[in-house]
Amino acid sequence: MMRSRLAVFLLAAVCAMVLTGCQKNVTLKVETEIPKPLVTKLPLSVGVYYPDAFRRYEYTETTEERGTWRIESGDSQVRAFNRILSELFSEFRELNSPQAGAVELIVVPEIAKMQFSMPKETGFDYFEAWVEYVVKLQTGDGEELPAWRFTGYGQARTGRFAGFETGLADSLSDALRNAGAQLATGLPAHPPVRQRAQRTGL
């Protein structure tokens, strides 16, 4: 009986050590290049205001299964939105305040959620990432307009010699590029934006 209990205790201790060893402390900074969108500029003057939470966005997670993750993407998020918005509208500028009113339309993006999955969790041979955005809109004189919500999705296959950090970073970069493509096509079609562009273009 004593040997049996000792064996169980040792097995539990070994399992705990293995689980602890599998936990990771990971810090990533997402870097990506957004291609120039092939779009026709809308005849609107637009300003974008980036809240600090967006400009410095950092995903953090600590769980027993995954360990501790810290993923920085704020700089890349700002560059991606600037890249797309500057090509979408005839006039574009960054604003220091969401109340600045020298433009016809003010865009205030927020990140609602970021998620990712790894091959060992899904059983597939690729990493996946999702970034959900809420784009708040208002006119230059402060009238709030219906917001637009969309999700960027990315995936990256596991490389034979690449670490999981590389695979995850690549899937997040892919999600940002996908978000840029959706922003380029979806925002101009969003009714409040489309209607104002049509009126201005008359």
PLM segments and residue spans:
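Sec-exported extracytoplasmic/periplasmic mature domains
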Residues: 86-94, 180-188, 192
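Mid-chain, structured segments of secreted extracytoplasmic proteins
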Residues: 75-97
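Short secondary-structure transition/capping segments
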Residues: 37-41, 128, 134-150, 184-201
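A structural "domain/chain start" motif
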Residues: 21-83, 188-202
